[in-house]
UniProtKB/Swiss-Prot annotation:
The protein, known as: Poly [ADP-ribose] polymerase 1
Organism field: Arabidopsis thaliana
Residue stretches of biased makeup (Basic and acidic residues): 215-226
Comp. bias (Polar residues): 379-388
A GO CC term assigned to this protein in UniProt: nucleus
Length: 983
């Protein structure tokens, strides 16, 4: 995911267009300004609220840490010091106007708070030696208490003990969590440093005595304190006193700015661009940006191209960063403190007559100095508005700091309450002040009172898997990946006219329609997801024409997926020709491609940093009048009517889409096209390759994972896109796409538009599958009931099954495809298959299918095939029912197994070996064969109770049967089953 933005940005104004949010006056060009970074409500991105720096530095409690300020390294040294002294003092009343006033007395009087921990990242830098603190190393932090003093100072434990040798490690917060081996290594360091510490303490005592600032007794008391006096002399910016490196950095910064001032005085913008071109540097940016790039190159040498994407680097946020794209889907993530530079001198254009440049060129040295930079501490910042301070973030990984409330019924809450308390976290019966997050169980109503209260109090609302992952990793995790945003506004039902739907936000849906001109339908939904920047945007573009007249409107709606509070919309009235011209202009601007290339599916190419159109097919080809389909009379049997209502219930599909976190606002009832799903599978296949193959370059692997994840979430818009980087997450996305395939079929076959005139009978006919209820006293019903009741596996204890209805099936054309295998192969069995309710319209219409070629080859123990079981509960697991929705559907299929290839452990294959027609995974528990029955003469029904098999070395608990040809399967019965969940 994108790194959280820093709360503040510091820079010199690039123009005189901004005004100060504090004093309301204009911020003149090149004036020092500070911007508070906030999420824009107008677009999907971050925007600065600019202020004069002097206005901010007069206030208290604004900037909590130097590391909270983006761009501080690019300021003049004097302005950098203003911010540092503001943070050190904790009050900004005098720092804005004085650069030389010492604030050490304030810092010295501040009480310090200390802690010790094992570093969870490699992002922090030691304030003493300026080296990185690597992941797994023990580090010590200090933090002054009091208003405004919220900056953390990190040190290697060894470096800290060299400065403060009398530290009682056992008294530090977090000492008990340090591994014994690390404790044993640290304790001798205290003992070794004690003699030197006594000398330093004596010197400090003598100095303080001469200065008259401390009495002798105070020094004695300090020896008994937890930390030596020397540690109190540290400034919040992290240094005991100006070191040689700090002085070098100051001198270098001043020299660099002298050069920038000369460039401003003597060199024009055009000459700066020419100079950058000659040196193969980027020429993009404002006059200030050009000046910065030229000064950097003149002083330190021209920058080489990015090693990952061959893009241009520039200095930003304390690092040299690449601003190019690793592919059309993703920005390049390369950044470094020590970039490669082109060998040789900085070049001056041959034709230049600029005397300053000519004079400078004669004096330039062939060997350039190296730029001195501070270690980047981007991971150790407070996150500004709505977040905890830096101290809290340093300890946020402890489960003891997690305070959880649960949304759901009492039975769902009780098990979680016990687990939360056992893990050491705190359970809150209701959301209140101090609650860290509200965890949503199951399908809790988004209008739930606790959820409304949590939103009012700005408490994070997260999914159950947040707690699962916290307990697994034994620490409090960030909420971002698990958040459930308010999607109540996103449940959009569309009003379809013609071949498309007018967006309801336009307010024109009642008396207008989408403009159609021949094969052209002027309606598109654009998507862009980039995990490296945090962008997850949509853009809707439509030409809307009045039903009675020729007037047209160009409608635009934009924002962030899953968040209706961010974005906006616009409706402009114009003539038809002007509307078409404006539509095409906007499409080209947003996608980098012409409308014709997309319409004709020729030469369309995704462009870096641009949107991608999504295929949305509303599944309707004619205009219809509004009617309630379920209220009309039907010729179907009552039990079949209830089944059809289950299959065609829009809320079932809506709930599935919500479970998958699909953006339902801009994908009305998730009508993704087959093309999008196919492209989603292709992205997952690439992710699978990256996860399974060893890569010697972790940075490149991470960038490629970001790129493939961007492709996936652009094709399949999600409320919470993230980097897919582990096997479980990957498999869940594969299952999601498999389910979406059937939702796509259901939407295309049945349609979910509210104005449909189709009755249940009409929808039933479109399934092309004859479905007949079985009488409960029939022989087939009793056999199936016995099969269900006797084959429940002993380990599946979470629920029991109750048979409600059985329907005989006859899919159109299926018997003819199956007949040759029925006669030729033999060895036929009646076997179980379970699936989500949302998959059954697709199954009844098209039969059981094998995963497509573009789907990743994972999650399939024995390859891509159709899987069956002889124990009912083995298949029932895949119905994914719950207490609120306890009724599921299951299949009994006649399967022509032929010669079986038997295995005791997983082995991927595209098809069984020569001479074999199916695969069987041998389980440790099997149905008792003496109780098997025959159906229709030669079809085996393995309806015996589970017993131990003779196979002892198998990795499988229960039998699995796999065929690799759909023609070997004939659907026979559909079962309506009630799951009686026990918890």
């Amino acid at each position: 995911m994108a790194s959280p933005h820093k709360p503040w940005r510091a820079e010199y104004a690039k123009s005189s267009r901004s005004s100060c949010k504090t004093c309301k006056s204009v911020i003149n060009k090149e004036n020092f300004r500070l911007g508070k970074l906030v999420q824009s409500t107008h677009f999907d991105g971050i925007m600065p609220m600019w202020n004069h720096a002097s206005c901010i530095l007069k206030k208290t409690k604004q900037i909590k840490s130097v590391d909270d300020v983006e761009g501080i390294e690019s300021l003049r040294w004097e302005d950098q010091q203003k911010i540092r002294k503001y943070v050190e003092s904790g009050a900004g009343s005098n720092t804005s106007t004085s650069t030389g006033t010492s604030t050490s007395s304030t810092a010295n009087n501040a009480k310090l708070e200390y802690g010790i921990e094992v570093s969870q990242t490699s992002r922090a830098g030691c304030r003493k030696c300026s080296e990185k603190i690597l992941k797994g190393e023990v580090r010590i932090f200090s933090k002054p208490e009091g208003p405004g003093n919220k900056g953390l100072m990190w040190h290697h434990a060894k470096c800290f003990l060299e400065m403060s040798s009398s530290t009682e490690l056992e008294s530090l917060s977090g000492w008990r969590s340090i591994p014994d081996s690390d404790q044993e290594a640290l304790l001798p360091l205290v003992k070794k440093a004690l003699p030197a510490a006594k000398t330093e303490t004596a010197e400090a005592r003598q100095t303080n005595s001469r200065a008259g600032t401390k009495r002798k007794n105070d020094s004695v008391d300090n020896e008994k304190s937890k930390l030596a006096k020397s540690s109190f002399d540290m400034s919040t910016s992290g240094a005991l006193q100006p070191c040689s490196k700090e002085k070098e950095m100051e001198a270098q910064t001043k020299e660099l700015w002298d050069l920038k001032d000369d460039l401003k005085k003597y060199v024009t913008s055009a000459e700066l661009r020419e100079m950058l071109e000659v040196n193969e540097q980027s020429t993009r940016g404002s006059e200030l940006d050009l000046r910065d790039k030229c000064a950097d190159g003149m002083m330190f040498g021209p920058l080489a191209l990015c090693p990952m994407c061959s893009g241009h680097l520039s200095f930003s946020g304390g690092l040299y960063r690449c601003h190019g794209y690793i592919s059309e889907w993703s920005k390049c993530s390369h950044s470094t403190l020590d970039p490669d530079r082109i060998k040789g001198k900085w070049k001056i254009p041959d034709e230049t007559e600029n005397q300053f440049l000519l004079k400078w060129n004669k004096s330039q040295k062939s060997v350039k100095p190296k730029r001195i930079l501070r270690p980047v501490l981007s991971g150790e910042t407070s996150q500004g508005q709505g977040s905890k301070d830096a101290t809290d973030s340093s300890r946020s990984e402890r489960l003891a700091d997690l305070k959880v409330s649960i949304a759901g019924n009492t039975k769902e809450r009780q098990p979680w309450k016990k687990r939360i308390e056992e893990a050491g976290a705190e359970f809150h019966a209701n959301v209140k002040k101090g609650t860290s997050c509200l965890v949503v169980c199951g399908l809790t109503d988004i209008r739930d009172a606790e959820m409304r209260k949590a939103r009012r109090m700005k408490v994070a609302i997260v999914r159950e898997d947040y707690l699962v992952d916290c307990f697994k990793k034994q620490r409090k995790l960030p909420f971002d990946k698990y958040k459930i945003e308010d999607t109540s506004e996103s449940l959009v039902t569309v009003k379809v006219k013609g071949r498309s739907a007018v967006h309801e936000a336009s307010g024109l849906q009642e008396h207008c329609h989408i403009l159609e001109d021949g094969n052209s339908i002027y309606n598109t939904t654009l998507s862009m997801s980039d995990l490296s920047t945090g962008i997850n945007s949509y853009y809707i573009l439509q030409i809307i024409q009045e039903d009675k007249g020729s007037d047209c409107y160009v409608f635009r709606k934009w924002g962030r997926v899953g968040n209706e509070k961010i974005g906006g919309n616009k409706v402009e009235e114009m003539s038809k020709s002007d509307a078409v011209h404006e539509f095409k202009r906007l499409f080209l601007e947003k996608t980098g491609n012409t409308w014709e290339s997309w319409e004709q599916k020729t030469n369309f190419q995704k462009q870096p940093g641009k949107f991608l159109p999504l295929d949305i097919d509303y599944g309707v080809n004619k205009q219809v009048a509004k009617k309630e389909p379920f209220q009309t009379s039907s010729n179907l049997a009552p039990s079949l009517i209830e089944l059809m209502k289950m299959l065609f219930d829009v809320e079932t599909y809506r709930s599935a889409m919500m479970e998958f976190e699909i953006n339902m606002s801009e994908m009305p009832l998730g009508k993704l096209s087959k093309h999008n799903i196919q492209k989603g599978f292709e992205a997952l296949t690439e992710i699978q390759r990256l996860l399974t193959e060893s890569d010697p370059q972790p940075t490149m692997k991470e960038s490629l994972l970001v790129d493939a994840s961007n492709r996936f979430f652009t094709m399949i818009p999600s409320i919470h896109p993230h980097i897919i980087r582990d096997e479980d997450d990957f498999k869940s996305k594969v299952k999601m796409l498999e389910a979406l395939q059937d939702i796509e079929i259901a939407s295309r076959i049945v349609g979910f538009d509210v104005d449909s005139t189709e009755s249940l009978d009409d929808k039933y006919k479109k399934l092309h599958c004859d479905i007949s209820p079985l009488p409960h006293d029939s022989e087939d019903y009793r056999l199936i009931e016995k099969y269900l009741n006797t084959t429940h596996a002993p380990t599946h204890t979470e629920w029991s099954l109750e048979l409600e209805e059985v329907f005989a099936l006859e899919r159109e054309g299926e018997f003819d495809k199956y007949a040759p295998h029925r006669e030729k192969l033999g060895n036929k069995m009646l076997l179980w298959h379970g699936s989500r309710l949302t998959n059954f319209v697709g199954i009844l219409n098209q039969g059981l299918r094998i995963a497509p070629p573009e789907a990743p080859a994972t999650g399939y123990m024995f390859g891509k095939g159709i899987y069956f079981a002889d124990l009912v509960s083995k298949s029932a697991q895949y119905c994914y029912t719950c207490k609120k929705n306890p009724v599921g559907l299951m299949l009994l299929s006649e399967v022509a197994l032929g010669e079986i290839h038997e295995l005791t452990k997983a082995k991927y294959m595209d098809k069984p070996p020569r001479g074999k027609h199916s695969t069987k995974g041998l389980g440790k528990k099997v149905p008792q064969d003496s109780e098997f029955a025959k159906w229709r003469g030669d079809v085996t029904v393995p309806c015996g109770k589970p017993v131990s098999s003779k196979v002892k070395a198998s990795e499988l608990m229960y039998n699995e049967y796999i065929v690799y040809d759909t023609a070997q399967v004939k659907l026979q019965f559909l079962l309506k089953v009630r799951f009686k969940h026990k918890r």
